[in-house]
């Protein structure tokens, strides 16, 4: 199947909410080796975000059930086996995405925007791996995630407006990493607040095309700040996960 057909099929799969098919098509497009257009890049990102998202939420539900189940319960082994099955699927998806990023996408990125987009993606997928990892494996995965986010963050500060949706989305996810993975609410709040304040200060630079995306992410940054500051103030509040991009 040629590139045009693969992209048409990916769009069709998206409309049908068949994200596994969508991801398969966009993986094939990526493996053809050419730099992706913005549209192709977004199709790839949406496909895998949905594919991995289903596993992440399933893993959380099963883990929660596992924690509430008595260890002597006969169902315990069944629950554990099922969690491990979902974990295995999640790891496989993340590994596939990280291979595409390292082999094709980051190497082929010719502009700062694409580079930041893909490095953010790399940080995200290592973060998803860190959510289910333990021991030395978790430590290494966290380091990989932080390294990718930091590299993307440094480029975005140098090359992009504070109101750019990719820069804002990166700040959002990097702050979630600090809060949820490193358990560092102070740094998470500082990063999110700085990104929000810098964007507010330069609202006049908002591109008309990206106005909706930028303001939505700014709202998510503010929502997370509200949630995290109420958490740290010790209010009766579930440690709900922060919104991410």
From Swiss-Prot:
What keywords sit in the KW lines? Cytoplasm
Q: Where in the cell is it found?
A: Cytoplasm
Q: Which family does it belong to?
A: Belongs to the 14-3-3 family.
- Official protein name in the record: 14-3-3 protein theta
Q: How does it assemble?
A: Homodimer, and heterodimer with other family members.
List the SMART domains: 14_3_3
What this protein is reported to do is described as:
Adapter protein implicated in the regulation of a large spectrum of both general and specialized signaling pathways. Binds to a large number of partners, usually by recognition of a phosphoserine or phosphothreonine motif. Binding generally results in the modulation of the activity of the binding partner.
Query: Does the UniProt entry include the keyword RNA-binding?
Result: no
User: In terms of domain of life, where is this protein from?
Assistant: Eukaryota
Show the InterPro entries listed in the entry. Answer: 14-3-3, 14-3-3_CS, 14-3-3_dom_sf, 14-3-3_domain, 14-3-3_theta
- Which CDD domains does its entry note? 14-3-3_theta
Cytoplasm as UniProt keyword: yes
PANTHER family in alphabetical order: 14-3-3 PROTEIN
Site feature location: Interaction with phosphoserine on interacting protein: 56, 127
Its gene is: YWHAQ
Q: Name one GO cellular component term.
A: cytoplasm
Q: Which GO terms describe its biological process?
A: protein localization; signal transduction
In its UniProt entry, the species of origin is given as Gallus gallus
